[in-house]
Curated annotation (Swiss-Prot):
Annotated keywords: Ribonucleoprotein, Ribosomal protein, RNA-binding, rRNA-binding
Family as reported in the entry's similarity comment: Belongs to the bacterial ribosomal protein bS6 family.
Disulfide bonds: none
Gene: rpsF
Gene source species: Prochlorococcus marinus (strain NATL2A)
GO cellular component: cytoplasm; ribonucleoprotein complex; ribosome
Lineage, uppermost ranks: Bacteria, Bacillati, Cyanobacteriota, Cyanophyceae, Synechococcales
Protein name as catalogued: Small ribosomal subunit protein bS6
PROSITE patterns in alphabetical order: RIBOSOMAL_S6 (PS01048)
Length: 138
């Protein structure tokens, strides 16, 4: 076998857990991957976001993303640990074809610049209301 495949795991934690617990979950799942001789490439906390539909009576969730490279056996171990955790409300692992692209930081600099639209002054042929009033007074 030439090179180990790349994987990306995204999981959603309950929104009511404290930030320290979120960090402990991230460390816990990274350690599970390292014990299975898997290289953890990247881990990102995506933050609290609104869910598309309620999951276990939660309308929001804390999104966390793990990118790793391994032989594939680590996925079952990782997903089993997530399934047993009460704090994880949803998870998914996707096998990537090649190396994962490095995510770009989200900031206002990366947003396309909006061009300022200056209103053009157009004169109409019909007289305005003010002009009509002036004409009627004369």
């Amino acid at each position: 076998m030439s090179e180990q495949p790349y994987y990306e795991t995204m999981y959603i934690l309950r929104p009511d857990i404290p930030e320290e617990e979120v960090d402990s979950h991230l460390k816990k799942y990274s350690e599970i991957l390292e014990k299975s001789e898997t290289e953890v490439l990247d881990s990102q906390m995506r933050g609290k976001r609104r869910l598309a539909y309620p999951i276990a009576k939660h309308k929001e969730g804390i999104y966390v993303q793990l990118s790793h490279k391994g032989n594939g056996q680590q996925v079952a171990t990782l997903e089993r640990a997530m399934r047993l955790s009460e704090d994880v409300i949803r998870y998914i692992t996707v096998k990537q074809d090649g190396p994962l692209p490095t995510p770009k930081p989200t900031s206002k600099e990366n947003e396309p610049e909006k061009e300022e639209v200056k209103p053009t002054e157009e004169k109409t042929e019909s007289p305005s209301k003010d002009e009509k009033k002036e004409d009627s007074k004369e």
